[in-house]
């Protein structure tokens, strides 16, 4: 556990250092005098690290968290907490973790593995016993951090988000803004010089809402029991093992401290596996070692003694050891500029009190100024100009374009650069983190941002060791920071086989990706400002600057194949969001227009120089979190989404409509009924969009009819707003499928938050909150009633006819334009060999009204007839499916041969990647295949193209003749809700089977030309940068109209 085990060590082995306190008494002790007539001084200001306190802010470990979250119960708890703090003269400031923290990626990988195992234990427990799991298996419901953040904003509790290094920013923010104490639960905070450190896990609010208690850690007592000077805590923390120098690299040193005669020495190497000593034993041994160090400034001598048993990568370990010490010393440095707006409590002489680093127990009831304070000199320090304070209390939704960024471009080196005086540089341990030092990922070329280098120079001038911390790299194929170390390790003298205690410990690998497109400085300034204020989805800023995103673990049964993983289910949403963030549609349209004018290549065959690739870190079935997935950004094909600057900052009515249309298009819900308040109320729009998206998923049944009704019935139930009655509601037997459906739904809500913020917040955040439409426990009760008792819709609505009518209207709006029919007979012929590598269309282009098919098809028995306006999907001259056509006049030409795929007939798809051209380019063994290119060379950056338009026309003519003779068609049908045959394998989850089809007959919600955004990820993935359908004159006229 390394340094992270120090927190538990204090509680178990230093009982005198853990003192229970009541925060209201501490607040009363900070008042001036004791008379009632005197006004109180400034309130007791506490900074709360939300990452360690989410379960307490959620309301505790009550048993119904597994059902997807009881958000009204959480809202009531936070309301009581806010009321108690206001009555007790306590001011809370909650700091959320919004940093990507590539330097702690290996810790995140371990945590994801543990949570994934916990999720399987939860599912197994529910399947076997049907009861809620024990609280030790608490797994935060999806979207819990965002919901807590929005609830705190509702109760006017200030919030903020970190942006680079969460721990350092929390410590710096706590000191520079005059907080009396920190409420957290992390060893990094315990080992830094924080005067008042309270336990987040012990934070409790009494039932009457009048007493708020917790525990305080007295670090001077801890130092006394360890017999260690607090000034040596940085070396102590570095030798325990941390995110810079993990305890696996220090295993040989820890075992050497114990000695061969120690009772645990026999466990040093067991079964050829690395075994670490117990944490409490290591802490005592390292404390004894640090106590006996003669000169704590001679780091070279200390490192030489520590790594004398190391057999490989010694120089790298020494470098990391020095960076770890610099990291913890930076957290213990005193304030360079005290906060001008905060004054400590003056003593009778008028002099502001100074607090020692570790207060004595006599100071518990009356906390003095917690930081060293001096009277104001009339000016503000640099740290105050760019901090998280002065957040307006926004009781109602304020449009994004009205929330201008206070950051002055002239003061900041770059709109995307964070002031180095405020944000200490984060130490990275992953390969290629902060390699370029420009605020973006080292894996992206960022030469188009010259102002970032300017800010970096000022950072180097202010802090000498910042450059060393910012270049802390992990050996990897893509990183270049450790070339010298790797070269030295590969010399003949270092070619011996290392022992287990000196093997490399990084269990993740980064991948180099193409450079990100340039983003407007105004957009970056707004994104940074809103990110730090906690007003935006945290990963939007990191996608814009670093091109990376993390996806949390959800409760899903990895053995059962009935439901897809949430990361795969909502990946198309994220792909379209990435396209919106980087203004992909407008950029591509301009490039196509330019290429067409220069007569270089027809627009149908235009391919950009490089695609926009986002790295997604996720862990689910068949995917390890150790490597990222390369996901390509997609653009809407049927309409040109405006650029991000106009989408965010535009004030015209048309801009507002475009925001809403972009959001609906990302959620595949661009239908007129979604904007009809009579059918879909505003506060239920997110609910209906997520349910419609789940219904459209091809290949695997996600929502049945009765399950859809259960979701809608609980959303309009009066019991939703009665958390006390829901607590008394008893559920006899939990259903594992219901638990997984709740997790999938909340994952969809999380993606809806992402899409809404990325599109400029067309839906006010007050109407996005899940307590307006979801309660996990109520949903499980409705699901049991609908599936087990076979209750009718009127019974699900508790006999209220008006509620049943609302459910009917919402269901019709959700299913508008979606036509599903059941397959009666199997396909007459098996799919062609190329099918697994050419995913068929599962989300066809929407079209105008179309009557349901009747009678028998003309081709084969049991196959639904093709509509008169329909078309065929032909790949490599073979018909692999039929799909609903568009308006009259659109051509039905087949896909050109430049559609590419991966591998050969005997090659599988690269592990952990999706079916996009760029992933096939960067994936292992990826090759492009096309007619006329039999002798294919190594993987290319682009698919091959015909040399002339004549050859293309000749190829298309040949394919059209071949397609008429090859009559292999799909069934054109779906099971009950977009399902193919239930026996379909899980490998066909993404639509590779070609057996599921859905037709849409809806119009666009905000467009009169009936042009709906394409909802087919595979068509976009295969053709976004290669080829497109040839457009007829009518289509060209519409395109000219848009231009």
Curated annotation (Swiss-Prot):
Major subcellular site: cytoplasm
Looking at the record, which segments are called RNA binding? 801-1043
Instruction: Tell me where it resides.
Output: Cytoplasm; Cell membrane
Instruction: Please list the residue ranges that the record marks as compositionally biased, kind Low complexity.
Output: 995-1010
The record, for InterPro entries, names: Coact_PPARg (IPR026784), PIN-like_dom_sf (IPR029060)
Give me the ranges of the annotated region Disordered: 353-497, 929-1043
**Where do Polar residues bias regions lie?**
362-375, 405-419
KW Disulfide bond (keyword) present: no
Task: For this UniProt record, give its keywords in alphabetical order, as a comma-separated list.
Answer: Cell membrane, Cytoplasm, Membrane, RNA-binding
Skewed-composition ranges (Basic and acidic residues): 451-471, 951-964
An example molecular function term from Gene Ontology annotations: RNA binding
Q: Tell me its family.
A: Belongs to the constitutive coactivator of PPAR-gamma family.
What does the UniProt record say this protein does? May bee involved in the oxidative stress-induced survival signaling. Binds RNA. May participate in mRNA transport in the cytoplasm.
This protein is called Constitutive coactivator of PPAR-gamma-like protein 1 homolog
Instruction: State the species of origin.
Output: Xenopus tropicalis (Western clawed frog)
Q: What is the lineage of its organism?
A: Eukaryota, Metazoa, Chordata, Craniata, Vertebrata
Q: Which gene encodes it?
A: fam120a
């Amino acid at each position: 556990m390394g340094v992270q085990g120090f927190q538990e060590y204090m509680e178990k082995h230093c009982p005198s250092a853990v003192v229970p306190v009541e925060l209201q008494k501490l607040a009363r002790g900070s008042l001036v005098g004791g008379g009632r007539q005197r006004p109180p001084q400034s309130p007791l200001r506490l900074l709360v690290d939300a990452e360690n306190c989410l379960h307490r802010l959620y309301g505790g470990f009550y048993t119904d968290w597994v059902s997807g979250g009881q958000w009204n119960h959480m809202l009531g708890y936070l309301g009581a907490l806010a009321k108690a703090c206001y009555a007790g003269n306590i001011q809370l400031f909650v700091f959320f973790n919004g940093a990507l923290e590539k330097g702690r990626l290996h810790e995140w990988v371990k945590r994801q593995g543990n949570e994934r195992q916990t999720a399987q234990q939860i599912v197994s427990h529910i399947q076997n016993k049907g009861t809620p799991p024990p609280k030790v298996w608490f797994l935060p419901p999806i979207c819990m951090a965002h919901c807590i953040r929005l609830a705190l904003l509702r109760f006017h509790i200030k919030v903020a988000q970190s942006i680079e290094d969460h721990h350092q920013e929390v410590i710096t923010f706590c000191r520079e803004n005059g907080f009396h104490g920190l409420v957290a639960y992390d060893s990094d905070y315990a080992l830094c010089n924080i005067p008042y450190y309270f336990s987040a896990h012990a934070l409790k609010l009494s039932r009457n809402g009048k007493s708020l208690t917790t525990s305080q850690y007295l670090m001077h007592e801890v130092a006394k029991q360890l017999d260690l000077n607090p000034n040596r805590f940085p070396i102590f923390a570095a030798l325990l093992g941390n995110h810079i120098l993990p305890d696996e690299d220090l295993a040989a040193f820890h075992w050497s401290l114990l000695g061969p005669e120690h009772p645990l020495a026999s466990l040093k190497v067991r079964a050829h596996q690395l075994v670490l000593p117990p944490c409490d034993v290591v802490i005592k041994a390292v404390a004894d070692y640090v106590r006996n160090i003669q000169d704590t400034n001679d780091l070279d001598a200390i490192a030489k003694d520590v790594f004398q048993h190391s057999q490989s990568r010694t120089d790298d370990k020494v470098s990391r050891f020095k960076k770890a010490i610099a990291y913890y010393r930076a957290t213990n440095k005193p304030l360079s500029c005290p906060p001008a707006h905060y004054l400590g409590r003056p003593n009778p002489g008028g002099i502001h009190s100074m607090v020692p680093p570790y207060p004595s127990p006599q100071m518990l009831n009356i906390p003095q100024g917690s930081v060293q304070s001096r009277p104001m000199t009339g000016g503000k320090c640099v740290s105050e100009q760019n901090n998280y304070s002065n957040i307006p209390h926004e009781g109602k939704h304020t449009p994004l374009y009205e929330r201008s960024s206070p950051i002055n471009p002239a003061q900041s080196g770059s709109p995307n650069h964070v002031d180095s005086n405020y944000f200490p540089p984060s130490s990275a341990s992953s390969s290629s983190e902060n390699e370029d030092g420009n605020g973006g990922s080292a894996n992206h070329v960022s030469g188009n941002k010259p102002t970032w280098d300017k800010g970096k120079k000022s950072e180097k001038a202010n802090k000498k060791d910042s450059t060393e911390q910012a270049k802390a790299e992990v050996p990897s194929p893509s990183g270049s920071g450790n070339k010298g170390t790797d070269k030295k390790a590969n010399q003949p003298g270092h070619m011996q086989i290392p022992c287990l205690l000196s093997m490399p410990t990084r269990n993740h690998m980064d991948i180099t990706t193409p450079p990100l497109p340039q983003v407007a400085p105004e957009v970056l300034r707004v994104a940074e400002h809103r990110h730090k204020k906690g007003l935006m989805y945290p990963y939007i800023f990191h996608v814009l600057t670093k091109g990376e995103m993390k996806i949390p673990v959800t409760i899903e049964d990895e053995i059962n194949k009935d439901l897809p993983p949430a990361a795969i289910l909502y990946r198309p949403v994220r792909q379209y969001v990435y396209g919106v963030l980087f203004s992909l549609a407008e950029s591509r349209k301009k490039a196509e227009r330019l290429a067409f004018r220069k007569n270089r290549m027809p627009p149908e065959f235009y391919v950009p120089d490089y695609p926009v690739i986002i790295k997604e870190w996720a862990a689910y079935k068949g995917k390890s979190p150790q490597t990222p997935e390369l996901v390509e950004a997609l653009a809407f094909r049927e309409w040109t989404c405006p650029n991000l600057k106009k989408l965010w900052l535009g004030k015209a009515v048309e801009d507002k409509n475009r925001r809403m249309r972009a959001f609906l298009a990302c959620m595949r819900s661009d239908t007129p009924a979604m904007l009809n308040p009579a059918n879909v109320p505003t506060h239920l729009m997110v609910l209906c969009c997520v349910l419609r998206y789940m219904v459209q998923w091809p290949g695997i049944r996600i929502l049945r009819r009765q399950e859809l009704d259960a979701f809608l019935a609980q959303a309009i139930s009066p019991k939703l707003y009665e958390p006390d009655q829901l607590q008394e509601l008893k559920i006899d037997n939990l259903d594992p499928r219901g638990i997984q459906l709740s997790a999938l739904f909340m994952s969809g809500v999380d993606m809806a938050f992402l899409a809404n913020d990325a599109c400029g917040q067309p839906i006010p955040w007050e109407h996005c909150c899940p307590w307006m439409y979801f309660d996990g426990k109520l949903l499980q009760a409705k699901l049991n009633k609908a599936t087990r008792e076979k209750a009718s819709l009127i019974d699900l609505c508790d006999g209220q006819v008006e509620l049943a009518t609302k459910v009917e209207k919402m269901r019709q709006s959700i299913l508008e334009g979606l036509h599903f029919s059941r397959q009666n007979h199997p396909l007459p012929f098996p799919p062609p060999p190329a099918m697994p590598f050419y995913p068929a269309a599962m989300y066809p282009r929407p079209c105008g009204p179309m009557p349901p098919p009747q009678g028998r098809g003309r081709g084969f028995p049991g196959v639904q007839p093709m509509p008169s306006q329909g078309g065929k999907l032909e790949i490599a001259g073979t018909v692999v499916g039929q799909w609903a056509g568009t308006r009259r006049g659109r051509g039905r030409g087949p896909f050109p041969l430049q559609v590419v795929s991966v591998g050969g007939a005997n090659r599988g798809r690269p592990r952990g990647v999706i079916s996009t051209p760029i992933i096939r380019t960067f994936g292992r063994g990826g090759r492009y295949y096309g007619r006329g290119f039999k002798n294919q060379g190594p993987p290319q950056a682009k698919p091959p193209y015909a040399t002339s338009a004549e050859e293309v026309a000749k190829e298309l003519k040949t394919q059209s003749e071949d397609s008429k003779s090859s009559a292999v068609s799909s069934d054109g049908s779906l099971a009950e809700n977009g399902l193919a045959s239930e026996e379909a394998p899980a490998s066909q989850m993404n639509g590779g089977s070609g057996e599921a089809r859905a037709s849409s007959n809806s119009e666009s919600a905000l467009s009169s030309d009936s042009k709906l955004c394409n909802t087919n990820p595979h068509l976009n993935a295969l053709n976004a940068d290669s080829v497109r359908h040839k457009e007829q004159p009518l289509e060209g006229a519409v395109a000219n109209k848009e231009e």
